[in-house]
UniProtKB/Swiss-Prot annotation:
It catalyses: shikimate + ATP = 3-phosphoshikimate + ADP + H(+). Its EC number is 2.7.1.71. PROSITE patterns: SHIKIMATE_KINASE. Keywords: Amino-acid biosynthesis, Aromatic amino acid biosynthesis, ATP-binding, Cytoplasm, Kinase, Magnesium, Metal-binding, Nucleotide-binding, Transferase. Catalyzes the specific phosphorylation of the 3-hydroxyl group of shikimic acid using ATP as a cosubstrate. This is Shikimate kinase. GO terms for cellular component: cytosol.
Amino acid sequence: MHRESIFLVGPMGAGKSTVGRFLADKLHYQFLDSDQVIEDKTGATIPMIFDIEGESGFRAREKAAIDDLTQQSEIVLATGGGAILNPENRKNLRSRGFVVYLKSSVDSLVQRTRHDRNRPLLQTENPEQVLRKLIEERGPLYEEVADLVIQTEQVSVHRVVKQILDKLAEQKII
């Protein structure tokens, strides 16, 4: 039986890390978070990398991490919200695993991220406006790479994980 890796995409606050941990546990896969891998490798936080290297420096590190991580088997990978901006990342995600887009409304994302200081793009006067713009810009790219789209709003983590597991079983991926 082929044991494909699962890649979670979606905006910040959609639940990729939370869902990813539960999903990995159910599948007996390793859970990895691309942002955490970058922080571990550099010894710096994502906001610190943004401050020192700018968004372009962070995106270069993210591209290298996604290339490396997507080559591993039997992992559940939570990607950063902007990972899909890079065409090579989209190609690697699509071709190397099963991609799940965790979708949520802007209002829900605002609620989930409002106290999180570890999200450099939201450190503005109007995080809601930033999230709307990001969803408008990135939404079609999330859709483009997704094998499965799951609405995470007002649904428990366990229900989201069950929906993913059901689809993986239906497509004989697990």
